[in-house]
Amino acid sequence: MELVLKDAQSALTVSETTFGRDFNEALVHQVVVAYAAGARQGTRAQKTRAEVTGSGKKPWRQKGTGRARAGSVKSPIWRSGGVTFAAKSQDHSQKVNKKMYRGALKSILSELVRQDRLIVVEQFSLEAPKTKLLAEKLKDMALEDVLIITGELEENLFLAARNLYKVDVRDAAGIDPVSLIAFDKVVMTADAVKQVEEMLA
């Protein structure tokens, strides 16, 4: 199959298996959920009554004081006591094998092509790391919410995009399923397309 280059009067021949396969919604959902789960820190930690600092001695005798009975200063109902169901550090990551991950990326890229959300250009670069230059370039292309993918990371482009809302720049090796579906449009250079094809082959 062929993808038309927007900034040149030519087309780029690409693999049908990468850019023309059927959309597998279940697979994409599983991989996106796993990717998001892997990004969770999971570092929360609270102390149970067994872990809180304090004496194990009964605060006062059981009967005769007129006060409510108490067996420990570490009780969850006391101030500074332990937490009843204390949250602990957790690894939320889910296993996704390489074949599934690559399959999901191919499904997403193919769907972007079908929905006319993937724009392929010969090259995408800036003369200087100026946000204004990038903003004007995107305005000329009628793009706002966009992910730009280049073969190698363009430093000028990366620096210029940092201050633009809903604009992100990646190199071909840095693509992920969540980023690909998060933006309205995806702009890829011809080099990036070839690199992604090799990566997913």
UniProtKB/Swiss-Prot annotation:
Top-rank taxon, per record: Bacteria
Coiled coil: none
Keyword rRNA-binding (UniProt): yes
Protein's UniProt keywords contain Ribonucleoprotein: yes
Keywords tagged on the record: Ribonucleoprotein, Ribosomal protein, RNA-binding, rRNA-binding
Gene Ontology biological process: translation
Gene Ontology CC: ribonucleoprotein complex; ribosome
GO molecular function annotations of the record: rRNA binding; structural constituent of ribosome
Positions of the UniProt region annotated as Disordered: 51-73
InterPro entries per UniProt: Ribosomal_uL4 (IPR002136), Ribosomal_uL4-like (IPR013005), Ribosomal_uL4_dom_sf (IPR023574)
Biological role stated in the UniProt entry: One of the primary rRNA binding proteins, this protein initially binds near the 5'-end of the 23S rRNA. It is important during the early stages of 50S assembly. It makes multiple contacts with different domains of the 23S rRNA in the assembled 50S subunit and ribosome. Forms part of the polypeptide exit tunnel.
Subunit structure: Part of the 50S ribosomal subunit.
Family per record: Belongs to the universal ribosomal protein uL4 family.
Name used for this protein in its record: Large ribosomal subunit protein uL4
Organism: Erwinia tasmaniensis (strain DSM 17950 / CFBP 7177 / CIP 109463 / NCPPB 4357 / Et1/99)
